[in-house]
Design a protein with these regions (language model features):
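Short secondary-structure boundary motifs at beta->alpha junctions and helix caps
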Residues: 80-90, 161-212
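A structural "domain/chain start" motif
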Residues: 30-95, 219-231
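Acidic, proline/glycine-rich low-complexity intrinsically disordered segments
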Residues: 94, 103, 107-111, 122, ...
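Sec-exported extracytoplasmic/periplasmic mature domains
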Residues: 102, 106-110, 211-219
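Sec-dependent bacterial lipoprotein signal peptides
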Residues: 1-30
Length: 231
């Protein structure tokens, strides 16, 4: 009986040891997986000296589901998309766009975004609703055609607490604008940092245009902005 017990013990030890070995191999394989690279959009704009706007409210942006994700999506000219799981935004692209649109407008206008600040009413404010139908990184066999394609529309609505609710209260209180453009990616450098830098430049153009539309509405003037249609 003692010999049988020893054999059983020896067999159990081997099985257990084999299980530990496989677990170690599995963990080693997992640890060797590529480490993702993370990128952020960063608005870099120059302040407007003539801005009198003090309060804005930047709402979450609209963005197609196909690109509203953390992994960076590259699209080719045929419409085929490639999701880069190891090249990622630090948050979803929609959040990156909203947060940096807000940061850029605050810097550009010298204003405070009350959307997340808890600031109450009492001052004239401007609510900005933005919808990106395109913010696509487009790859091409022809390096000269690599670009970030942008199509964006926005509505700026003025909230003036001093205006009473009468038949004229909606006059000059809202402005709707749209723009589309391509931002070329430098053909001499296809690194992801250059792609992200180009996306930043594209966002900066949007920030500049939105800021000028807010300034126009604040001054009760028609918005005349290069490459932008406003009604």
């Amino acid at each position: 009986m003692k010999k049988i017990d020893k054999k059983l013990f020896h067999t159990a030890f081997i099985v257990r040891g084999t299980g530990v070995l496989f677990a170690a191999i599995f963990l080693s394989a997992c640890s060797s997986s590529p480490v993702p690279n993370y990128y952020s959009l960063t608005a870099q704009v120059s302040p407007l000296a003539n801005s009198k706007v003090t309060v804005i409210e930047v709402l979450p942006v609209g963005l197609p589901d196909r690109i509203n994700r953390a992994p960076i999506v590259i699209q080719d000219v045929t419409g085929k998309s490639q999701i880069l799981d190891n090249e990622r935004w630090t948050s979803t692209l929609g959040t990156e766009l909203r947060d940096n649109l807000s940061a850029g407008l605050q810097q550009k206008l010298g204003a405070v975004d009350r959307y997340n600040s808890g600031m109450v009413g009492g001052k004239i404010s401007y609510r900005i609703a933005t919808d990106f139908s395109r913010f696509d990184i487009v790859n091409s066999t022809n390096q000269a055609n690599e670009k970030v394609e942008v199509s964006v529309a926005w509505i700026v609505k003025r909230n003036d607490p001093t205006i009473t609710l009468d038949q004229n209260s909606n006059q000059n209180q809202q402005l709707a604008c749209r723009m589309s453009f391509n931002q070329a990616i430098a053909s001499n450098n296809k690194q992801m940092q250059q792609v992200v830098s180009t996306a930043n430049s594209a966002l900066n153009r949007v920030v500049d245009a939105v800021a000028l539309s807010i300034i126009s509405l604040d001054a009760n003037k028609s918005a005349r902005i290069d490459g932008v249609t406003c009604t």
